[in-house]
C-alpha cells in the first residue's frame, strides 16, 4: 500500500511523467534483459509492435528492381530509407502480397515429390468418408501408435545416412548404406530430386517424415493403424465418436498387417514340424512380404504381436519384456513372486502339476477389446478391475484373470477331463488346459466364484455371474470400470532366449510367449506374401501342394536323378515331399510307397526301363514309410478338390499330364514347368555324342565318388576318371581322354561300350 502511494505521488509530479515517457531506458538490468542473447524475450509483443510499423520487413537491395515502388492502389511497397546497421531496404507487408500475386513463377514439379506425405494425406481425406457422430462414453486407452502414415521403416541412423547422401551428396562424413531398402530409397530419391530448388533443410525434414516411423503414446478408442491416427482429433472426443473410413491405405499399415499374418502362419506351421525352431527360421528366411525379405522387415518393424515376437526372438532380436497369456499382454507393475511346482486336483479329480507364483503382484492386462488391472496374492485373486467394449470382451478378460490367479475354486470348477492338444497333437501345459476349458464354457467357474456386496464407487460397477451389471452385488473381487487401462508405455526391449519348441523366456527364465498364445484368427494379407519354403505350400490348399511338389522335382531334376539312382533313401526323406503326404489317403499311404519303391528298384535293375516321366510322377508317393505287400496299382489316389483324383501309373491323367511334343508338364491344368531332357526317346545317341572325348572304362567304381550328371563332366581334367549317370539311369566309369585326336571314334565305341559295361 505504501509503495503504491509513493508511486502515485511520483506520477503527480510533471517531471516524472516526462522522464518515463521521453527518455531512454538506461537501467542496466533492463537493457541486459532485453538485449542479451539471440532469444526473443517477448515474441508476440515484438511481432505486434513490429507489424504496427510501416516497414517491418528488411529485404535484399535487389528487391527494388523486382518490385515497383507503389502498387495499383498507390500504396508504397518499399522505403528509400536503408535499414539501420545493414545494407538492406525496409519493406512493407504489402510488398509480400504484391510478390505473391505478381512475382515470378518457379517450377512446382518437385513439390508433390518433396511434400509427398502431405499430398497423400489430402488425397486420403478427400476420398475418406465421415459417418454420423455418436454420443457415448469413450473407453480410451493409451497405446503406442504410429502417427506418420506412408513411411518406410528405417532406423533413425539409417534414415540420417540416406538423407545426407540424397541432400548433401558431396559433404564429407562416413556413411555406409548397407540395407537393401537404404540403397533403393537413395537411388529413387536422387532421381526424383534432380534440379530441385526447394531448400535442402526442408527436403531433409520431409525425407525424415517419409523414412522413419514416428510413434506417440495416445489415448485411442478405435482403429490403431496410422491412417486412423492421423484423424484422431476428428473421430473421437471425450463423449463422442465420429465414424470414418479412410480414403486410401498406406504401405506401412499394410506391412504391419501382412507381417502379423505371415508370422502367425509360420509359427502355426513350425509348431507341428519335427524341429519347430529350425523350421521357423528356415521359413522366416525364405519368405518375402510385398517383395521385401521378411527377416529385413522383422529387424526394422516395431510391431508387437505374439507371433511376430516369437519370430524376432528366434532371430536373436530383443522384444518387449511383457508376457502373454490368453491373448492378453500382461505387464507386472509392482510386487514380485517366486515359482514353485504344486500338484492340484480338479473338480474331476484329475491331478495337474502347475507352477504356482508365490507372492503379491499387480499387473496390467491389455487385450484387443478389453483391458484390466489385476492384483493377486499366492493362488488368490484380490482385485480385478475390467473395462471392455462389450459383455463378451469383459467375460474373456475375467476368465483369463481367474485362470491366471490359480485360485482353488477355479480348479475345482473343472468338469470333465482336460485333454486339449495343440496343432502337433501334444498335450497343452496345465495352465493352457484350464484356459481352454473355461473359454469353452465358464458357467460353473462364474457360479462357483462367489459374490459380495459392493460399495458405491464413482465410475465402478459390479458384475454378476451371468455377466449382467449390478450396483449392489458383484463377483468376488471383480469390478467393471468405465475407464480403460493404458497399455504399457515403455518401449524398452530385453534380451530373450527361445527353446526348440518356440517357448520364449526372459533372462530370469519366465516364459513370455509360446505357440499356444498365437491367435488362430485368419485374415487376408494386404501385400503378397511369398513363402518359398516347402513347409508353407499347404497354406493355399491341396492343389498348391501338388503343383509345388512337381515343380520342385522338375527344377531340381539333375540332382534328383542322381540321388534316385545312388541314394534313394536320402531322396525319399527330403522335407519337400512332406506336405504331399497329407494328400494321400492315410490307410493306403504305406502300400503305395512300398509299390513305388519296388517299381523304382526294378527300373534300376533292368536295363532300358528308366522312364523319367514315371519317376517324376511317382516319386512323391515313395516318401511315406513303406509297407511291404504284393499289391499292384494301376492308379494312385490323391485328395484334391474335395475328392479323390487318380494319377495313372502309366499314362496321362487330368492330375498329371506330360506333353511329349512341348515337353511341358501340367498338374491339374496348371503349368508345372518344362523338362530339359526328353524322357521317352532313346537317348543313347545323345549320350554317345556327349561322351565324345571320354573313354568308357566299365561298370561304376564307387572309389571315384558319386555319379556326375553329363553336364558336370566338362569339369574333368584330362586323364581324370569319374562315374557318370547316363540316360537309362545307369552309371558307368569314364576317363577324360588325354589326346583330342581320337574323339571321333568315341561316339561309335561309346554305344557298344555302354552296353557291355552295363551287362
Curated annotation (Swiss-Prot):
Subcellular location: Virion; Host nucleus; Host mitochondrion
One function term, GO molecular function aspect: RNA-directed RNA polymerase activity
Domain of life of the organism encoding this protein: Viruses
Keyword Protein transport attributed: no
InterPro entries associated with the record: Flu_PB2_2nd, Flu_PB2_6th, Flu_PB2_C, Flu_PB2_CAP-bd, Flu_PB2_middle, Flu_PB2_N, INV_PB2, PB2_helical
Cysteines joined through disulfide linkages: none
GO BP annotations, alphabetical order: 7-methylguanosine mRNA capping; cap snatching; DNA-templated transcription; symbiont-mediated suppression of host cytoplasmic pattern recognition receptor signaling pathway via inhibition of MAVS activity; symbiont-mediated suppression of host gene expression; symbiont-mediated suppression of host mRNA transcription via inhibition of RNA polymerase II activity; viral RNA genome replication
Keyword tags: Cap snatching, Eukaryotic host gene expression shutoff by virus, Eukaryotic host transcription shutoff by virus, Host gene expression shutoff by virus, Host mitochondrion, Host nucleus, Host-virus interaction, Inhibition of host innate immune response by virus, Inhibition of host MAVS by virus, Inhibition of host RLR pathway by virus, Inhibition of host RNA polymerase II by virus, mRNA capping, mRNA processing, Viral immunoevasion, Viral transcription, Virion
Intervals of motif Nuclear localization signal: 736-739
Residues of the site described as Mammalian adaptation: 627
Coiled coil: none
GO terms under cellular component: host cell mitochondrion; host cell nucleus; virion component
Protein family per UniProt: Belongs to the influenza viruses PB2 family.
Protein function: Plays an essential role in transcription initiation and cap-stealing mechanism, in which cellular capped pre-mRNAs are used to generate primers for viral transcription. Recognizes and binds the 7-methylguanosine-containing cap of the target pre-RNA which is subsequently cleaved after 10-13 nucleotides by the viral protein PA. Plays a role in the initiation of the viral genome replication and modulates the activity of the ribonucleoprotein (RNP) complex.
The protein's assembly and partners: Influenza RNA polymerase is composed of three subunits: PB1, PB2 and PA. Interacts (via N-terminus) with PB1 (via C-terminus). Interacts with nucleoprotein NP (via N-terminus). Interacts (via N-terminus) with host MAVS (via N-terminus); this interaction inhibits host innate immune response.
Protein name, as recorded: Polymerase basic protein 2
Gene symbol of the encoding locus: PB2
Amino acid at each position: 500500500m505504501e509503495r503504491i502511494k509513493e508511486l502515485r505521488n511520483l506520477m503527480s509530479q510533471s517531471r516524472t511523467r516526462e522522464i518515463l515517457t521521453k527518455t531512454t531506458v538506461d537501467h542496466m538490468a533492463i537493457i541486459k534483459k532485453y538485449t542479451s542473447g539471440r532469444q526473443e524475450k517477448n515474441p508476440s509483443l515484438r511481432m505486434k509492435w513490429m507489424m504496427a510499423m510501416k516497414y517491418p520487413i528488411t529485404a535484399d537491395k535487389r528487391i527494388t528492381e523486382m518490385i515497383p515502388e507503389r502498387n495499383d492502389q498507390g500504396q508504397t511497397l518499399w522505403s528509400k530509407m536503408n535499414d539501420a546497421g545493414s545494407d538492406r531496404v525496409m519493406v512493407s507487408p504489402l510488398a509480400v502480397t504484391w510478390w505473391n500475386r505478381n512475382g515470378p513463377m518457379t517450377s512446382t514439379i518437385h513439390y508433390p515429390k518433396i511434400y509427398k506425405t502431405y499430398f497423400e494425406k489430402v488425397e486420403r481425406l478427400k476420398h475418406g468418408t465421415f459417418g454420423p457422430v455418436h454420443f457415448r462414453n469413450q473407453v480410451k486407452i493409451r497405446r503406442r501408435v504410429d502417427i506418420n502414415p506412408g513411411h518406410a521403416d528405417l532406423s533413425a541412423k539409417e534414415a540420417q545416412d540416406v538423407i545426407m547422401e540424397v541432400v548433401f551428396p558431396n559433404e564429407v562424413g562416413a556413411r555406409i548404406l548397407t540395407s537393401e531398402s537404404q540403397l533403393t530409397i537413395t537411388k529413387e530419391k536422387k532421381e526424383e530430386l534432380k534440379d530441385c530448388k526447394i531448400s535442402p533443410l526442408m527436403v531433409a525434414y520431409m525425407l525424415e517424415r517419409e523414412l522413419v516411423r514416428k510413434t506417440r503414446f495416445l489415448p485411442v478408442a478405435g482403429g490403431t493403424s496410422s491412417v486412423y491416427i492421423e484423424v484422431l482429433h476428428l473421430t473421437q472426443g471425450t463423449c463422442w465418436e465420429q465414424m470414418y473410413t479412410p480414403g486410401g491405405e498406406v504401405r506401412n499399415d499394410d506391412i504391419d498387417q501382412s507381417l502379423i499374418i505371415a508370422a502367425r502362419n509360420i509359427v502355426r506351421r513350425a509348431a507341428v514340424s519335427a524341429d519347430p525352431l529350425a523350421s521357423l527360421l528356415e521359413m522366416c528366411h525364405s519368405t518375402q512380404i510385398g517383395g521385401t525379405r521378411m527377416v529385413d522387415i522383422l529387424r526394422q518393424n516395431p510391431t508387437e504381436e505374439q507371433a511376430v515376437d516369437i519370430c524376432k526372438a528366434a532371430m536373436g532380436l530383443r522384444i518387449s519384456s511383457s508376457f502373454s497369456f490368453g491373448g492378453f499382454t500382461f505387464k507386472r507393475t509392482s510386487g514380485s513372486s517366486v515359482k514353485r511346482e504344486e500338484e492340484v486336483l480338479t473338480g474331476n479329480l484329475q491331478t495337474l502339476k502347475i507352477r504356482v507364483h508365490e507372492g503379491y503382484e499387480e499387473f496390467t492386462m491389455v487385450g484387443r477389446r478389453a483391458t484390466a488391472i489385476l492384483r493377486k496374492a499366492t493362488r488368490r485373486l484380490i482385485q480385478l478391475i475390467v473395462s471392455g467394449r462389450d459383455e463378451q470382451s469383459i467375460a474373456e478378460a475375467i476368465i483369463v484373470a481367474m485362470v491366471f490367479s490359480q485360485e482353488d475354486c477355479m480348479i475345482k470348477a473343472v468338469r470333465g477331463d482336460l485333454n486339449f492338444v495343440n496343432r502337433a497333437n501334444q498335450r497343452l501345459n496345465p495352465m493352457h488346459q484350464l484356459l481352454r476349458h473355461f473359454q469353452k464354457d465358464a458357467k460353473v467357474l462364474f457360479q462357483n466364484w462367489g459374490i459380495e456386496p459392493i460399495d458405491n464407487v464413482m465410475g465402478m460397477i459390479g458384475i454378476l455371474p451371468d455377466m449382467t451389471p449390478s450396483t449392489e452385488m458383484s463377483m468376488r473381487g471383480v469390478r467393471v470400470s468405465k475407464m480403460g487401462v493404458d497399455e504399457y508405455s515403455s518401449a524398452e526391449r530385453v534380451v530373450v532366449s527361445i527353446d526348440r519348441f518356440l517357448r520364449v523366456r526372459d533372462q530370469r527364465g519366465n516364459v513370455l510367449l509360446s505357440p499356444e498364445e498365437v491367435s488362430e484368427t485368419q485374415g487376408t494379407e494386404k501385400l503378397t506374401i511369398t513363402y518359398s519354403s516347402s513347409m508353407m505350400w499347404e497354406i493355399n490348399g491341396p492343389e498348391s501342394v501338388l503343383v509345388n511338389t512337381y515343380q520342385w522335382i522338375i527344377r531340381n531334376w539333375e540332382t534328383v536323378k542322381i540321388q534316385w539312382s545312388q541314394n534313394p533313401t536320402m531322396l525319399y526323406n527330403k522335407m519337400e515331399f512332406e506336405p504331399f503326404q497329407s494328400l494321400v489317403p492315410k490307410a493306403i499311404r504305406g502300400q503305395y510307397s512300398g509299390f513305388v519303391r519296388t517299381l523304382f528298384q526294378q527300373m534300376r535293375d533292368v536295363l532300358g526301363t528308366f522312364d523319367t516321366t514315371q519317376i517324376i510322377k511317382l516319386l512323391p508317393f515313395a516318401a511315406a514309410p513303406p509297407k511291404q505287400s504284393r499289391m499292384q496299382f494301376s492308379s494312385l489316389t490323391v485328395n484334391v478338390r474335395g475328392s479323390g483324383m487318380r494319377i495313372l501309373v502309366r499314362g496321362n491323367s487330368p492330375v498329371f499330364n506330360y506333353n511329349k511334343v512341348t515337353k511341358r508338364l501340367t498338374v491339374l491344368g496348371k503349368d508345372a514347368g518344362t523338362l530339359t531332357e526328353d524322357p521317352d526317346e532313346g537317348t543313347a545317341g545323345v549320350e554317345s555324342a556327349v561322351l565324345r572325348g571320354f573313354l568308357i572304362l566299365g561298370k561304376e567304381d564307387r572309389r571315384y565318388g558319386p555319379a556326375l550328371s553329363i553336364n558336370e563332366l566338362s569339369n574333368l581334367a584330362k586323364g581324370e576318371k569319374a562315374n557318370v549317370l547316363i540316360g537309362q539311369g545307369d552309371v558307368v566309369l569314364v576317363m577324360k581322354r588325354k589326346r583330342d585326336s581320337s574323339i571321333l571314334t568315341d561316339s561309335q565305341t561309346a554305344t557298344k561300350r555302354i552296353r557291355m559295361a552295363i551287362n
